[in-house]
């Protein structure tokens, strides 16, 4: 069997490229990101946290006061600023992928879609949907499903799709790290591959 990469060699193979976690709200990006970052000796950044700290207000407040367009513009600027740095695991807002210009930045790194199934996503969001401005309304499940279906073709532009069920953040991060190895091996020139078979 193949010898697994250590965190050090995985980091070396990444060459400082940022890892962007995308996916719907409630998919676990903010929980998985720090664990993954620790595994591969990267730093972790959450775009929503950066926006809230810089604006000194919650995401829902920005939506309510200024509207989604203003928020997306702020989000785009934050993404651009963060991407000036390297060796980061970056958890992005669920709708960040909807702006085509953001993909120019995302594709500079490795884009990983955490795809939590609809039933589990809705169950997670039922307790805190008031913090999710796009889900406000009478029918959370219907609103969520419509948003998911509209974004799914965009999420499919990712380099890697991880189907999430009931795994812990550690388990999801481990899955990501394992699949990252395969992606990086596929991207290596054939002559540079050094996987050892036992």
From Swiss-Prot:
Species per Swiss-Prot/TrEMBL record: Prochlorococcus marinus (strain NATL2A)
Name assigned to this protein: Shikimate kinase
Membrane spanning residue stretches: none
First-level EC class: transferase
Keyword Signal part of the UniProt annotation: no
UniProt GO cellular component terms: cytosol
Quaternary structure and partners: Monomer.
Homology family: Belongs to the shikimate kinase family.
Role played: Catalyzes the specific phosphorylation of the 3-hydroxyl group of shikimic acid using ATP as a cosubstrate.
